[in-house]
């Protein structure tokens, strides 16, 4: 097996990712427990050649101190997006990447 930190690069933090984490745990006002998803979901940036079993093993190895168990892994590749810099003169592309939505067993979290 590869080093877990070569498979999972970093935790992906966006508004949508935080919503997936927060709504599943039912914390905060105005949020109903289980209104969006039953189990906690976290999003990670992973290596392009990583498979779902590799990602699950790496997450469990990285967070072994917290004793998390992975229930399900969904992956998707985000395509590079065109960009323009300085009034459209310099054109380029953002980097594409692969992300994984990891669902933990109910009652487990990394937060």
Swiss-Prot record:
Keywords linked to the UniProt accession: Ribonucleoprotein, Ribosomal protein, RNA-binding, rRNA-binding
Molecular functions (GO terms): rRNA binding; structural constituent of ribosome
Biological process terms in GO annotation: translation
GO cellular component, one term: ribosome
Classification via InterPro entries: Nucleotide-bd_a/b_plait_sf, Ribosomal_uL23-like, Ribosomal_uL23/eL15/eS24_sf
Pfam family, one: Ribosomal_L23
HAMAP family reported in the protein's UniProt record: Ribosomal_uL23_B
Protein function: One of the early assembly proteins it binds 23S rRNA. One of the proteins that surrounds the polypeptide exit tunnel on the outside of the ribosome. Forms the main docking site for trigger factor binding to the ribosome.
Family the UniProt entry places it in: Belongs to the universal ribosomal protein uL23 family.
Subunit structure: Part of the 50S ribosomal subunit. Contacts protein L29, and trigger factor when it is bound to the ribosome.
Protein name in UniProt: Large ribosomal subunit protein uL23
Source organism (scientific name): Chlamydia trachomatis serovar D (strain ATCC VR-885 / DSM 19411 / UW-3/Cx)
């Amino acid at each position: 097996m590869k080093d877990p930190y070569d498979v999972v690069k970093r935790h992906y933090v966006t508004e949508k990712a935080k919503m997936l984490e927060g709504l599943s745990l039912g914390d905060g006002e105005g949020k109903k427990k289980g209104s969006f998803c039953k189990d906690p979901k976290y999003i990670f940036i992973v290596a392009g050649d990583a498979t779902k079993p590799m990602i699950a093993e790496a997450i469990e190895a990285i967070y072994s101190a917290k004793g998390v168990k992975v229930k399900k892994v969904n992956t998707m590749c985000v395509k590079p997006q065109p960009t323009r810099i300085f009034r459209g003169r310099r054109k380029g592309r953002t980097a594409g990447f692969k992300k994984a939505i990891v669902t933990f067993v109910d009652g487990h979290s990394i937060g």
